[in-house]
Amino acid sequence: MNENVVIKVDNLTKDFGDQKGIFDISFSIKKGEMVGFVGTNGSGKSTTIRCILGFIKPNKGESYVYGKESWSHSSSFIKEIGYVPGEIAFPDLNTGTDFLKSQAEFLKLKDFSHANRLIKILTLDPSANLKRMSKGMKQKTALVAALMHDPDILIMDEPTTGLDPLMRINFMDVVKAEHNKGKTILMSSQSFEELENSCDKVIFLLNGRIVSIASIDEIKNRPEQDFKIEFTNHEDYEAFKALDYTIIRDQPQYHQVTVSIIKGRVNDLMKDLKIYHLKFISEVKYTLERHFKKIANIKEEN
């Protein structure tokens, strides 16, 4: 295995029956990369993560961390990973402080300085009773526990789900700071925007299978630009459609088209549009969400 590859998943399959599970999943994550998982509920994000951590034995295929097979050798690398689960269930302890101390003992951690910095950044009160903690406080406590020993790998399963917008930003600022320090990060999320603003690449899962692995740089720097144009009358709409433009979406009921052009040809488009009566023209940004909908063949809303 390439020494620069930290996590490798090779034809991983875990079949729960009734077409539920993951099937022939393959990808790799290099040192220092931040990779996102996105997909509908039940698409296999959590199952893949649990296989990587050695919590679930696959029916077929393997996953590796630092070149060590997950199911057989997870004990040799698990302490080098910071993990934030999708469903946080604390042990029967009184406070967040008690939980963090128990984690420190498990990790044989004696220096609490990094944990204290994280507590301050996240404005967390660890003395709060675990059972009375809000969703946000539980997420913060879990993140501190995952990062307190300064691991090289961080794996998080939808860590910001249920957080209010301000807390989500605060949480992701900490994650981005870890990425900037060179940490290798795998994070699943329901938020396309969150992944687009933080990841190097994103893996799309649908019905337990990978349908696309997208580079964020390629999405942001694609050579085409898309424009939505609405005409005031049917005649102009039909006349424009007869021109040599790539129409990627046609909505005749609104006299509206979306065209894709090569960057640098905007002036040509504007010249061609001068003779028509327009209601509006606007650029349609190509986002991670649009890419996923295109791959998954999901129709965009108006």
Model feature map: region roles:
Residues 225-302:
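Short, charged/small-residue-rich alpha-helical element at the C-terminal edge
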